[in-house]
């Protein structure tokens, strides 16, 4: 009976170790943040595919509601998408005169992947 108890505890400990590893690995990989700056009056030009980006956190900022963010990040045209790594800007995509972004999901994903791979 004691052998079965020890084996059960070892298995449980192994599973807990795996869960802990997954949690730690998941929390360290969220170093890349993609922030989409836009304004309520320009919602027609929201970047709809942004949520399909992988291995990053995605945030949206309405510059009308958060003018301090607009000033801090020097947003002069909307939409603007900025990719941050560890809080530092690494790439910026800005709208053209039509207030729409020409960058593709693939272009942004490439930048995200490059940033993640630069850690290795």
Predicted features along the sequence, with ranges:
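Structural micro-motif
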Residues: 73-83
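Extracytoplasmic/secreted envelope proteins and their assembly/folding machinery
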Residues: 46-47, 67-70, 105, 109-112
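A short beta-strand-loop structural module common to alpha/beta enzyme folds
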Residues: 57-65
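Non-catalytic, surface beta->alpha helical segment in thiol-disulfide oxidoreductase systems
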Residues: 85-120
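Local sequence-structure signature of Cys/Sec-based thiol-disulfide redox active-site neighborhoods
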Residues: 29-57
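Active-site-proximal beta-strand/loop segments in catalytic clefts of secreted hydrolases
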Residues: 37-39, 63-64, 96
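Bacterial N-terminal signal peptides
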Residues: 13-25
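Bacterial N-terminal signal peptides that target proteins for export
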Residues: 2-16
């Amino acid at each position: 009976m004691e052998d079965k108890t020890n084996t059960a505890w070892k298995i449980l400990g192994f599973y807990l170790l795996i869960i802990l590893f997954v949690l730690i690995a998941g929390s360290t990989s969220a170093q890349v943040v993609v922030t989409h700056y836009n304004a309520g009056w320009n919602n027609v030009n929201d970047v709809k595919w942004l949520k399909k980006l992988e291995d990053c956190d995605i945030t949206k900022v309405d510059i009308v509601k958060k003018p301090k963010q607009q000033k801090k990040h020097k947003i002069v045209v909307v939409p603007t998408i900025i990719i941050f790594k560890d809080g530092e800007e690494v790439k910026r995509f800005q709208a053209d005169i039509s207030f729409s972004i020409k960058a593709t999901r693939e272009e942004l994903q490439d930048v995200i992947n490059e940033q993640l791979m630069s850690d290795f």
